[in-house]
Amino acid sequence: MRVVVSRVFSLGVTGVEGYLVTVEVDIGPGLPCFEIVGLPGRAVREARDRVRAAVSNSGFTFPVRRIVANLAPGDIPKAGALYDLPLAVGILAADGQIPEGPLERWVFLGELSLDGGLRPGRGVLPMCLSLPALGLGTVVLPADSACEAAAVPGLEVGGMSCLADVCRAVEAGRLPHGGRRGTRQAGPMEGADGVGARPTGTLHGDLAEVE
């Protein structure tokens, strides 16, 4: 059986500074399991159950094989549930259920509910502020977090409602209607988690409305 490895970009935050996280997913032979390595915190380890349910309830097949996901760099602790979405996308790409094309230029963030819906999380703004320096210009995240991400000038923001919508965008190779384009810098009254942010990006259209 051929071993397949996918790579999906995500973000982490240390203090108020964001950094790039590469989510590598290996699917191979062996006893069925789903392991996450790379200093995952408790919420990250619990992603195994959320991702498994979300994938199955979104109309996809969760692979009954040995799955190992690595969150690189491996020497920095990873916290929070925002790695749910990149983990799910990485598994589906490694299993050949969605194409890998857009994965090399998009960044994914978002907590998954058991039915495949996307939930917002904290720390989106400082994470996304790091993207221009990293040379990445597109982020896919929960629709309720799109306003925060739109505070980053020039950033293409895809606010999505569920995993199925994300996968449709990946299959199409583009965000619906060009996504939302960031047009301003974060204001001085906004905290590290974007509290106080107001949407100023021009909305060209999301794939689906917020649930």
Q: What does each of the following model-derived ranges do?
A:
Residues M1-E211:
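Peripheral, non-AAA+ core regions of ATP-driven protein-machinery
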